Amino acid sequence: MTVSHHPTEELILSYASGALDEANSILIATHLSLCSECRDIYNAAESIGGELLDDIDTAEITNTSFDEFFSIIEHLPLDPAIKPSTSLPQNTFLPNPLRDYINFSNGKINWRWLGPGLRYHSIEASSEFAKVGLLKISPGTKVPHHGHSGKEMTMVISGGYTDGIDKFS
């Protein structure tokens, strides 16, 4: 797969620092799994972050530190949004970071019909302002006119489309 559009360095750096919400992290992690150019930027950001952590003064650990730590993590809620996938449908390519978020039923993705040639699969991800989903668009299908509120990021996993200005594949 040839990657022709890339997330901004700012998004990659935010992902590397752990500052992105889950919805945007899914997109960036999926992109990084396919794009060595952006993966190099990510790896450099992680190296810089590691160097910065090395320069931080260490904190004193008391006799009760470990007990306090384990008390905190014992009370953390489990994240129900991440569900391990079952078998991947035949002839379907899904990058690993995305695969764990897909709900399969009998080895198939549960697509919701949106119109002729249009299917949608919602992905649960915690985010205050973003949604994640898969669109399956049959060749030659025109996407109905629709509005956008906020910022939209799209990642083409297979095939391609044009919006009248740019071609995405």
Whereabouts are the PLM-identified features?
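Short beta-strand His + acidic residue motifs that chelate non-heme Fe in jelly-roll/DSBH
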Residues: 42, 143-145, 164
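Short, conserved beta-strand element in jelly-roll/cupin
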Residues: 135-139, 147-163
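Short acidic-glycine-tyrosine-enriched beta hairpin
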Residues: 163-169
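Conserved beta-strand positions that form and line the central face of beta-propeller blades
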Residues: 11-14, 122
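Short Cys/His-rich Zn2+-coordinating modules
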Residues: 13-22
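Sequence/structural segment immediately N-terminal to covalent heme-attachment motifs in c-type
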Residues: 27-32
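A short glycine-rich, His/Asp/Glu-containing loop-to-beta-strand
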Residues: 109-139, 145
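Positively biased amphipathic helices and basic secretion/translocation or surface-docking motifs
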Residues: 1-8, 23, 34-40, 47-107
